[in-house]
Amino acid sequence: DSPAGVSDAQKQ
């Protein structure tokens, strides 16, 4: 999925 450094807010 998203990169490990991404915030949960960014994932959404």
Swiss-Prot record:
Keyword Cytoplasm: no
Major subcellular site: secreted
Compartments (UniProt record): Secreted, Extracellular space
Known tissue expression: Hemolymph.
Disulfide bond entries: none
MF GO annotations: oxygen carrier activity
Record keywords, A-Z: Copper, Oxygen transport, Secreted, Transport
GO CC annotation terms, alphabetical: extracellular space
UniProt function note: Hemocyanins are copper-containing oxygen carriers occurring freely dissolved in the hemolymph of many mollusks and arthropods.
Family affiliation: Belongs to the tyrosinase family. Hemocyanin subfamily.
Protein name: Hemocyanin subunit 1
Organism, as annotated: Necora puber
